[in-house]
């Protein structure tokens, strides 16, 4: 949902932004998946075969879905897909699958986590997290892990924002501990991000 808001905000401002996700589980078709939702919501009209490389029906982690369905993620497929989508759009948002350590493939031939895909594609990261109780620890540990892998953290967006003293304090503590700015707060039903498009587009540089 946050990725859809991000892409829609930029496209509404006139930026030609595409979308890509390496693997999605828990959907029967691309149309039913997160990728299909982003494509519709942000009005990208991107061909389905450019949106997504691997679609798994089982609603489990991609590595397990791949094992069950016999279709493991291959690095060369991801690299080729990324080359194609970046050739079609000057800006591309890649949505992650789960958290930074989400297993994408884990078998006797190869072991990949989300962080591996990020490093293959040489991408910076925007951390998306729930705004509520427990988010300070989750965001701080995620940012610290990402930095230890020499991946740039461009900013943080807090989802399911309700407001109040606890969530405002979460923002202050996260920014103080990580040194990374909370760029936006997303409430249920929001149709755009509360951040100007120029700030968002600068994250792609």
Label each region the model flagged.
Residues 1-72, 76, 81-84:
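N-terminal phosphate/diphosphate-binding loop that engages ATP/GTP or pyrophosphate donors
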Residues 4-11, 114-118, 137-147:
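Histidine-anchored nucleotide/phosphate-binding helix
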Residues 16-17, 92, 125, 153-154:
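Hydrophobic anchor at the start of a short beta-strand
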Residues 21, 126-129, 154-160:
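Short internal beta-strands
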Residues 107-131:
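Inter-motif core of Ras-like GTPase G domains
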Residues 107-115, 140-141, 167-172:
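Charged helix-capping and loop-helix junction motifs
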Residues 143-205:
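C-terminal lobe/tail of nucleotide-utilizing enzymes
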């Amino acid at each position: 949902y946050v990725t859809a808001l991000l892409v829609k905000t930029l496209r509404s401002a006139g930026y030609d932004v595409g979308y890509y996700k390496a693997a999605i589980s828990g959907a029967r078709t691309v149309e039913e998946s997160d990728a299909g939702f982003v494509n519709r919501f942000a009005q990208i009209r991107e061909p389905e075969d450019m949106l997504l490389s691997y679609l798994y029906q089982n609603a489990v982690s991609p590595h397990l879905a791949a094992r069950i369905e016999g279709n493991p993620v291959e690095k060369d497929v991801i690299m080729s897909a990324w080359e194609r989508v970046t050739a079609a759009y000057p800006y591309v948002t890649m949505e992650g699958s789960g958290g930074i350590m989400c297993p994408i493939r884990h078998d006797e031939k190869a072991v990949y986590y989300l962080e591996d895909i990020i490093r293959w594609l040489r991408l910076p990261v925007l951390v998306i997290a729930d705004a509520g109780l427990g988010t300070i620890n989750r965001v701080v540990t995620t940012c610290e892990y990402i930095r230890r892998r020499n991946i740039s953290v461009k900013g943080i967006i807090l989802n399911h924002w309700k407001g109040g003293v606890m969530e405002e304090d979460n923002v202050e503590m996260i920014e103080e501990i990580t040194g990374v700015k909370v760029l936006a707060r997303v409430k249920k039903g929001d149709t755009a991000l509360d951040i100007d498009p120029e700030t968002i587009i600068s994250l792609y540089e």
